Amino acid sequence: MNIKSEFFRVDFIIGARRLSNYFWATVVFLGSLGFFIVGVSSYLQKNIVFFLSASDILFTPQGIVMCFYGIAGLFLSFYLWFTIFLDIGSGYNEFDKKKGIISIFRWGYPGQNRRIKLSFPIKDVQAIKLEVKEVLPARRMIYIKIKGQQDIPLNRIAENITLREMEDKAADLARFLKVSIEGL
């Protein structure tokens, strides 16, 4: 959902709360939990869960390795769920012609830089830049060029948009800001 008017525009950015992240966090959690349970079952020499058999697995070295992989996977899945819970990377791009300010906001990790907000005068915008790298996976980025600053990305790196959609977004934003488009 984006908000647009003649003098004001807000583009919302989806962060870590994507369906693919939920899927992979769940898969990693269940897989690592299975590894850990089988490793502990091999140590206890009895099946903790009826559908995960550990009778053919010796605790040394297979059970130890399975416990290690299970613990490592659980840490990874907790990290993924933590980023989903905090919605890391989400935010908005706000363009206000009346105030003459562009504000770019993103949520980060807890701590000093949890809220990342950049503000620039609209008059400092030089162009909208497009970058396309057709490697696996294809990388299509929209940047805003600002005087004296490095190019600032306006979309997610993992955002899977077609070339046409990217061109349309960039052209719409360039018309709104009355600047040119570079790239391609």
Curated annotation (Swiss-Prot):
Which membrane topology describes this protein? Multi-pass membrane protein
UniProt subcellular location: Plastid, Chloroplast thylakoid membrane
* InterPro entries with a match to the protein in the record: PSI_Ycf4_assembly
Keywords assigned: Chloroplast, Membrane, Photosynthesis, Plastid, Thylakoid, Transmembrane, Transmembrane helix
A Pfam short name: Ycf4
Q: Which residues form the signal peptide?
A: none
Major subcellular location class: plastid
Question: Where are its TM segments located?
Answer: 21-43, 63-85
Q: Which GO terms describe its cellular component?
A: chloroplast thylakoid membrane; photosystem I
Record's keyword annotation contains Membrane:
yes
A Gene Ontology annotation in the biological process aspect, one of them, is: photosynthesis
Q: Which PANTHER family match?
A: PHOTOSYSTEM I ASSEMBLY PROTEIN YCF4, PTHR33288
In UniProt terms, what function does this protein have?
Answer: Seems to be required for the assembly of the photosystem I complex.
Q: Into which family does the record put it?
A: Belongs to the Ycf4 family.
Q: What is the name of the protein in this document?
A: Photosystem I assembly protein Ycf4
Which source organism? Chaetosphaeridium globosum (Charophycean green alga)
